[in-house]
Swiss-Prot record:
Origin species: Azospirillum sp. (strain B510)
Descriptive protein name: N(2)-fixation sustaining protein CowN
Pfam families from the UniProt entry: CowN
Keyword list, A-Z: Nitrogen fixation
Function as written in the Swiss-Prot or TrEMBL entry: Is required to sustain N(2)-dependent growth in the presence of low levels of carbon monoxide (CO). Probably acts by protecting the N(2) fixation ability of the nitrogenase complex, which is inactivated in the presence of CO.
Coiled-coil blocks: none
Family to which the UniProt record says this protein belongs: Belongs to the CowN family.
NCBIfam families in the cross-refs: N2Fix_CO_CowN (NF033689)
């Protein structure tokens, strides 16, 4: 895909699967924060916020909003655990959806 064919969120979100991209990152994030050796108080609280985000009647922010608001913390977690695939997905999400 050349630069003219690449999705551009500033023009339109058409063709950008922000919901799917955020879901994949949330799944990837759980791979780390569900491991007791990798989690801490911040990630425990974040996991609780993700659970609330799944419930449209309770949520104040959806999963995409939580990811975008915490992108640097998530990047640090992925870097700390050498998760290059997670970082690539996160960069794509930030470029296309945040």
């Amino acid at each position: 895909m050349d630069s003219f064919d690449a999705p551009d969120r500033y023009v339109s979100f058409k063709g950008i699967d922000c919901e799917g991209n955020s879901r994949r990152i949330i799944d990837r994030l759980h791979m780390h924060i569900d491991d007791p050796a990798k989690t801490n108080a911040f990630w425990e609280r974040f996991r609780a916020k993700l659970a609330i985000a799944e419930d449209p009647l309770k949520r104040q922010a959806d999963g995409l909003c939580l990811l975008c608001a915490n992108i640097y913390y998530i990047a640090d977690l992925f870097e700390e655990h050498d998760d290059e695939d997670g970082l690539a997905m996160l960069r794509q999400l930030e470029d296309e959806c945040c």
